[in-house]
A protein has these predicted regions:
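Basic phosphate/pyrophosphate-binding loop/patch that engages nucleotide-derived ligands
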Residues: 105-113, 164-167
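ATP-grasp fold ATP-binding core
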Residues: 106-107, 129-149, 169-180
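Short loop segments at secondary-structure junctions
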Residues: 109-110, 122, 153-156
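Short beta-strand-to-turn element immediately C-terminal to the catalytic PLP-Schiff-base lysine
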Residues: 117-119, 149-154
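Phosphate-binding site of ATP-dependent enzymes
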Residues: 153-183
């Protein structure tokens, strides 16, 4: 493909998630690379520009992180506008962003996944520790990167992690610790 075959490309960045700053860094790096390739690319910060402004672009390079960028929302909007974009479709993005839903899909497909327990306001450290070896993790289901992920080995850490994770998402779960290198 030639640079002109992409048309005008909106590099979507920034947004409103708790990962805004890293999204801006990623977006500007992608914008520089596209411009170096002579692609007609433009920065588009979804926090400061209305999404209807996307109609003037032929395609979008998604550099939004977390909520509204990786959860299928922006993909659904781009689909409705008929704008092609990078990454997975809306449904795959939504499933990929939801850690708990992903684990259910893995189990249904017989794909091994660390043991986990859905938590609620009645959950307590002692009961979770009986089910999962100590230490374990508490995770907000819908959050990108490692935001909303807490390693827990005490009652105090458990209470703090549960409280903080609930600020991010209503669905929070505990997951066993698996030692190894993260890829």
């Amino acid at each position: 493909m030639t640079p002109s075959s992409y048309g005008q490309v909106a590099v979507l960045m920034g947004g409103n998630s708790n990962e805004r700053e890293i999204s801006l860094q990623s977006g500007h790096a992608v914008l520089r690379a596209l411009l170096e390739l002579s692609i007609d690319a433009f920065a588009f910060d979804t926090k400061h520009e209305t999404l209807t402004g996307l109609k003037k672009y032929d395609s979008a390079f998604i550099c939004l992180h977390g909520k509204d960028g990786e959860d299928g929302k922006i993909q659904s909007i781009l689909d409705a506008m008929g704008i092609r974009y990078t990454g997975s479709n809306a449904q795959a993005s939504a499933y990929g962003m939801d850690k708990y839903k992903s684990k259910e899909i893995f189990l249904a497909a017989n794909i091994p996944t660390p043991k986990f327990l859905l938590l609620n306001e009645k959950s307590n450290f002692r009961d979770v520790s009986k089910e999962l070896d100590n230490p374990f993790f508490i995770k907000a289901s819908n959050s990108g990167s490692s935001i909303g992920v807490y390693k827990v080995s005490t009652e105090e850490q458990f209470q703090h992690a549960l409280h903080e994770a609930k600020k991010i998402d209503d669905i929070v779960f505990a997951e066993e610790n698996i030692s190894g290198r993260e890829l």
